[in-house]
From Swiss-Prot:
This is Lissencephaly-1 homolog. Disulfide bonds: none annotated. Belongs to the WD repeat LIS1/nudF family. Disruption phenotype: Defects lead to convulsions mimicking epilepsy, possibly due to altered neurotransmitter function. RNAi-mediated knockdown results in arrest at the 50-100 cell stage, whereby egg and sperm pronuclei fails to migrate. RNAi-mediated knockdown prevents the sperm-donated centrosome from leaving the posterior cortex in 1-cell embryos. RNAi-mediated knockdown results in an abnormal distribution of GABAergic synaptic vesicles at synaptic termini of the ventral nerve cord. It comes from Caenorhabditis elegans. GO terms for molecular function: dynein complex binding; microtubule plus-end binding.
Amino acid sequence: MSLSERQKEEINRAIAEYMQNNGYSESFSVFLKESSLSENDIKPLGGILEKKWTTVLRLQRKVNDLESKLQESQREINHGAPTRDKRQAADWIPRPPETQKLTGHRLPITRVIFHPLWTIMASCSEDATIKVWDYETGQLERTLKGHTDAVNDIAIDAAGKQLVSCSSDLSIKLWDFGQTYDCLKSLKGHEHTVSSVTFLPTGDFVLSASRDHTIKQWDISTGYCVYTFRGHNDWVRMIRISNDGTLFASASLDQTVTVWSFATKSAKLVLRDHEHAVECVEWAPDTAYTNVTGQQPEGNSTHILFSGSRDRSIKAWNINTGDVLFTLLAHENWVRGLAFHPKGKYLISVADDKTLRVWELSAQRCMKAIEAHEHFVSTVAFHQTSPFVITGSVDMSCKVWECR
């Protein structure tokens, strides 16, 4: 395939601009002479040669991904397994191999999250940084620096415009997300490592949990702590807010899960059935209620909470009664993260046994186990509208898994 004269001229101009901008003065002069260009012909092209090179690399990655997916689909067809086209969206689950392996962090990954609107995700690490990635191409978009110790948790508000992070440096930071990526504010008040953070649904408050045994509510506009929740007697590992925004749950090393009311600013329930520290909690989406309970929801009775523990178990709780609905057992080490399929049929869990497991909630069984990483798997997230799951590990990598 030959190039037209116009295409040749465009390529020559792009090469000349690259040489000129990168200090290849002698080569630049020779190239102008041999290509019959003059310096007047070299107009600013905005680094088009580098952009085209980057585009080629991205396209090559996508070609490789498509080839992998084609091979996987062919294997499924050969073995009689249903292809993605034959499955309903509610039945799509993560399947190996991963579509992307993201490397760049220098210490273990502590949290991964999806942006609610764009095809990007964020990861944070014990290396004190937050990284922003395009999860479809695997491209690192940006690194946020500002913390001076491990970043333990991150969250993005519902509008996708702000990110909040918390750290072992005792601070919480608010970041612009999408425009400048600048740190907008630092919130200080905890007396020990800040381990978990999340936005309230309204977006004007942030909730944080700490190794100082407390949970704090912060006003974003002022940066001040407006309330401190006390009740745990050990490190609070994770906090999660209910889907309707009326309650939140906290998991602690004191082996309990506490459910708190925003209205009364007090504990509604203390859940005690785990035999070791509780690492994670996650509220089941309303779509999961029937799969979890076998009943149709009545009124506001859809508060179902799941917890994962160092005792290797996952428990489902009825928050109206405080009872354990059932316990899921299959992991061989600490359970570190939970995420629900948006359609409510499956629960995804990750653990220090290096696996990602898919649980069918209606049958209360582990239907699939994936050897996800080479070391402990510390975090997992399920995209709410696209068929992707991401995991992060102590092996310093994040992986993107397509659901099909």
